[in-house]
Amino acid sequence: ELEPLNYLPDWNKIDPQVLKDTKLIYLTYPNNPTGSTATQSVFDEAVQRFKDTDTKIVHDFAYSAFGFDDKNPSILASEHGKDVAIEIFSLSKGYNMSGFRVGFAVGNKDMIQALKKYQTHTNAGMFGALQDAATYALNNYDDFLIQQNETFRRRRDTFEAKLKEAKLPFVHTKGGIYSWLRTPPGYNSEQFETFLLQEKSILVAPGIPFGKNGNHYVRISLALDDKQLEEATERLTDLANMYNG
């Protein structure tokens, strides 16, 4: 039930009994789909609140390489972070290895052991060449991650500047690879998705699958080449009268 413009958890708004009964909390920053990011203090608060309980935390750090305004913090850098949390990393985004399904988790040893046990019973293993490629990427391509981040930051800046100029309402993307655009008056997310596809040949993701508060937003990927993104931006800004008319 998170709301713009920060999309950060407020534990005080959750029923204490619900928190007491909660076994697992799943956080993801930079956030998909909203593009919001967390500060270290957000993780500090979460760890301090749950470190003496039976509740554990999983932080999905798939978009760790993409932090445009500040460096993305790790929950494991919080005091006692490793006592209560694990962090999940993916090579799909930062290293352009989508489809290879390569990732890893670090953190709380008991959670890692449980994950290892589950993995042993559900997965026969990964093709060795993919593991070798992933290992090589991790050991040799830190500079590439910097370039990736700069590429997406530039796309974000250009895209948002055009939306702002046309007075289209959006949530400022602080990290990740998506933009979170509000729908025009009279449209929910699925209706606007259909409209954009049929009338503008633009494919977006409706916000409703991400929760009911996403019903008046659509997710737009910045993972396009500059020419495609420029064309899509022009088609979107042509709709300014739908928002401002």
Language-model region placement:
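Conserved glycine-rich beta-strand-loop-beta hairpin in the small C-terminal domain of fold type I
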Residues: 135, 151-160, 170-182, 214
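Conserved core segment of the aminotransferase class I/II
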Residues: 78, 82-153, 157, 161, ...
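A short linear hydrophobic-aromatic micro-motif
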Residues: 166-170, 203-208
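Helix C-cap/helix->beta junction micro-motif
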Residues: 52-53, 166, 200, 243
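Residue-level recognition of strand-loop junctions within catalytic nucleotide-signaling folds
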Residues: 108-109, 139, 182-184, 223-225
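PLP-dependent enzyme catalytic core of the Aspartate aminotransferase-like
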Residues: 15, 186, 195-204, 210-245
